[in-house]
């Protein structure tokens, strides 16, 4: 592991609106449904592809300021690279972006009948130690965990300070009735997945997602685990490159299809990208949250950026994956803050460094600058 650095890794995978009156967007050398092959190819003329070179330079200049500390950028349009710089091919911990990655696996394996998301924890034989679950807590269903509404507020060994501060009292809400961003839910989803499929998360992700969509870097052992005394359910982490996350975002942008093949069920992507209720924390509206994705709801999603249909995966420390269907746009933002020694305590400390609201504000402005660089207004 390299020496600790606090830098931001930004990868932007963009696919500009594919049709106008049924015609491909001007300047694209690939078809509207083009996908990268074994490696990414470059667009040769930015202006013909619908981009302002000057506005992209403005976005890059902001990304390189001390306030955001971007270390790499990758911009992809129509399956080709618009621009790139930095360590977009370096594997780093994705933090809570992991949740949207495992959601895709749940979509695949539930459609094949290996996982029933309507089963309860009791039916699945799920408990915890040293503090066991109550009878009521065991009535939470898998789908309640996927929606962060389990009603189980058990201690966990890895969480941010805000998670611990906002945790409700045990027994205060029944299963399925109250949203709380809960690492216990997310960790137990890892336990259930491996129990029901007989597969390690990394192996399943590699075989069913990474290989089919041509991820260049991900391997099965890029998923690692942390345990601790508070719970028997470990935290699973994904080490993944920005360019591989760009492919994952492109997969979701195309409703789970890759080059004509359905990888993640379309119905699952639909459930993951649409909300029907506003969630909030400490009186602040946050938009929607379904199947481990953050979703625009009621015009609420992210600072300076809220478009109908936008949804995102987010991790502590400014790890972001945005999917923006109305613009055929995918945005990935990474933070290269891997510690020299990987343990739960160190990673938890990194998760609590800086201000989450400040990180979001900085990246929200950067995302707006990038979107404004498109010559389509």
What do the predicted segments below correspond to?
Residues 217, 222, 274-330:
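Active-site Gly/Thr loop motif
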Residues 111-148, 197-235:
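Active-site helix/loop module of the DD-peptidase/beta-lactamase fold
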Residues 38, 42-44, 57-64, 98, ...:
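Active-site-proximal loop and beta-strand segments within enzyme catalytic domains
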Residues 23, 310-377:
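Structured C-terminal helix/loop/strand segments within mature extracytoplasmic catalytic/sensor domains
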Residues 7-17:
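Bacterial N-terminal signal peptides
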Residues 79, 93-118, 145, 189-193, ...:
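Active-site SXXK
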Residues 100, 188-192, 236-257, 319-335:
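Active-site-proximal alpha-helical segments within enzyme catalytic domains
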Residues 55-88, 321, 328-332:
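A short, well-structured edge-of-sheet supersecondary motif
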């Amino acid at each position: 592991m390299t020496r600790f650095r606090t830098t931001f890794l930004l990868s932007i995978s963009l696919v500009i609106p594919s049709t106008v009156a049924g015609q491909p967007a001007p300047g694209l050398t690939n078809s509207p449904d083009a996908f990268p092959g074994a490696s990414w190819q470059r667009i040769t003329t930015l202006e013909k592809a619908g981009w302002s070179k000057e506005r992209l330079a403005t976005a890059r200049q902001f990304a390189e300021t001390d306030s955001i500390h971007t270390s790499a950028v990758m911009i992809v349009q129509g399956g080709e690279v618009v621009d790139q710089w930095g360590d977009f091919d370096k594997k780093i911990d994705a933090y809570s972006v992991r949740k949207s990655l495992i959601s895709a696996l749940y979509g695949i394996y539930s459609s094949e009948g290996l996982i029933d998301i309507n089963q309860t924890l009791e039916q699945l034989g799920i408990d915890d130690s040293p503090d066991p679950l109550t009878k009521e807590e065991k009535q939470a269903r898998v789908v309640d965990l996927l929606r962060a509404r389990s009603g189980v507020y058990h201690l966990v060994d890895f969480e941010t300070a805000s998670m611990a501060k906002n945790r409700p009292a045990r027994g205060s809400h029944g299963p399925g009735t109250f949203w709380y961003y809960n690492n216990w839910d997310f960790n137990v989803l890892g336990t259930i997945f491996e129990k029901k499929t007989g597969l390690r998360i990394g192996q399943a992700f590699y075989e069913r997602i990474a290989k089919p969509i041509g991820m260049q870097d991900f391997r099965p052992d890029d998923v690692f685990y942390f345990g601790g005394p508070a719970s028997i359910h470990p935290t699973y982490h994904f080490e993944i490159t920005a360019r591989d996350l760009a492919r994952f975002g492109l997969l979701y942008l195309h409703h789970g299809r890759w080059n004509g093949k359905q990888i993640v069920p379309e119905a699952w992507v639909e459930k993951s990208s649409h909300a029907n209720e506003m969630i909030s924390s400490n009186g602040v509206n946050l938009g929607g949250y379904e199947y481990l994705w953050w979703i625009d709801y009621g015009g609420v999603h992210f600072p300076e950026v809220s478009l109908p249909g936008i949804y995102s995966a987010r991790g502590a420390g400014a790890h972001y994956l945005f999917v923006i269907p109305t613009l055929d746009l995918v945005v990935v933002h990474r933070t290269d803050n891997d510690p020299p020694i990987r343990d739960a305590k160190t990673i938890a400390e990194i998760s609590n460094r800086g201000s989450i609201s400040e990180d979001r504000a900085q990246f929200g402005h950067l995302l707006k600058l990038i979107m404004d660089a498109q010559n389509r207004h």
